[in-house]
UniProtKB/Swiss-Prot annotation:
Its EC number is 2.4.2.18. It holds the Pfam family Glycos_trans_3N. Anthranilate 2 binds at R165. Homodimer. It catalyses: N-(5-phospho-beta-D-ribosyl)anthranilate + diphosphate = 5-phospho-alpha-D-ribose 1-diphosphate + anthranilate. Catalyzes the transfer of the phosphoribosyl group of 5-phosphorylribose-1-pyrophosphate (PRPP) to anthranilate to yield N-(5'-phosphoribosyl)-anthranilate (PRA). Pathway: Amino-acid biosynthesis; L-tryptophan biosynthesis; L-tryptophan from chorismate: step 2/5. Belongs to the anthranilate phosphoribosyltransferase family. The gene is trpD. This is Anthranilate phosphoribosyltransferase. Its cofactor is Mg(2+). 5-phospho-alpha-D-ribose 1-diphosphate binds at residues 79, 82-83, 87, 89-92, 107-115, 119. It comes from Bacillus cereus (strain B4264).
Length: 341
């Protein structure tokens, strides 16, 4: 590890292979917590490259719990977090809208690191069992159409690092790679990131991971979601080509809304917002979910255009299908799935 730390101190990039080996060291028991913290801080100060991100993703996926990966066509819409905006749980709420529209959603997530309420905190508050095993997740994807993959369960080697990340209380490379380490063999992906200069590198990693189609977004105000506040910077991966775009919410019929107006709170407050949105209540929260779910449906290939994606997202909510998916997940995730274990 000393060689890698020395390179980072000198501002040098690590190669993909060096980062892969460093990643295996980070996940081992043969390293001091102070070394892990130093590595994360130095890497953040230098700035992460696509090669470094992919190298660490390789290490994490290698050490993750094994999946059969017989489920075809799955999607994740997990974002990086780390934007400091304290918004409600946009991507987690949107996940049920996607599922209600017929997308198989393998939602990867964690507890809060730099926000008040992470996806795991919200789902637990709503009554979802967040500790499903790989076999149970396969079952849920096949029979319910949505499953939650709790990062500490999927990546047991990350437990030490999670503690250090919490103590550092700043975004690190683990924010960036969270959405990229889903152990399910995803076909498509919608990724919100908090760093605009990482749009292309993250898209390049998704390309290396073999995604059929993907959309990476950095929202107005550097949100890790699409925002109603103004122009959103987007990179589309389609047909193995990467294209930069911008998305203006007003073009799709939305009024501009400041990011401060979609702030969330603790898990109880955010659960209330999620239930209101999925129940069809009109609000700025709903509009934010419609924009994000609409973009994700376009990224999935479920619709040909973003406009159609937004309409399909609205139908998923207003038909009751999105809320039904939540209720089905609550029930099925809490069953004793002995038949699949």
């Amino acid at each position: 590890m000393n060689n890698y730390l020395r390179k980072l101190v000198e501002g040098q990039h690590l190669t993909e292979e060096e980062m892969y080996k460093a990643g295996l060291l980070l996940l081992s028991e043969n390293i001091l917590e102070s070394e892990i913290a130093a590595f994360l801080v130095l890497l953040k100060a230098k700035g992460e490259t696509a090669e470094e991100i992919y190298g660490l993703v390789r290490a994490l996926r290698e050490k993750a719990l094994p999946f059969s990966n017989h489920i075809q066509g799955a999607m994740d819409n997990c974002g990086t977090g780390g934007d400091g905006a304290q918004t409600f749980n946009i991507s987690t709420t949107s996940a049920f809208v996607l599922a209600g529209a017929g997308v198989k959603v393998a939602k990867h997530g964690n507890r809060a690191v730099s926000s008040k309420t992470g996806s795991a905190d919200l789902l637990e508050e709503l009554g979802v069992n967040i500790s499903s095993t790989p076999n149970e997740i396969d079952y849920l994807l096949e029979h319910v159409g949505i499953a939650f993959l709790f990062a500490p369960v999927m990546h047991p080697a990350l437990r030490r690092i999670m503690k250090i990340r919490k103590e550092l209380n700043v975004p690190t490379i683990f924010n960036l790679i969270g959405p990229l380490t889903n152990p399910v063999n995803l076909e498509t992906q919608f990724v919100g990131i908090y760093k605009r200069d990482m749009l292309l590198p993250v898209a390049e990693v998704l390309q290396k991971l073999g995604r059929k189609q993907a959309l990476v977004v950095n929202g107005s105000g550097f949100l890790d979601e699409a925002s109603l506040q103004g122009e959103n910077h987007v990179v589309l991966l389609k047909d193995n080509e990467i294209v930069e775009m911008s998305i203006d919410p007003e073009k799709y019929g939305f009024s501009r809304v400041k990011n401060e107006e979609i702030r969330g709170g603790n898990s109880k407050e955010n659960a209330k917002i999620t239930l209101e949105v999925l129940s069809g209540e009109k609000s700025v929260y709903r509009d934010t979910v419609l924009l994000n779910a609409g973009l994700a449906l376009f990224a999935n290939g479920k619709t040909e255009t973003i406009e159609e994606g937004i309409k399909l997202a609205a139908h998923s909510i207003d038909s009751g299908k999105a809320l039904t998916k939540l209720n089905l997940l609550i029930a099925a995730s809490n069953e004793k799935l002995e038949r699949v274990n």
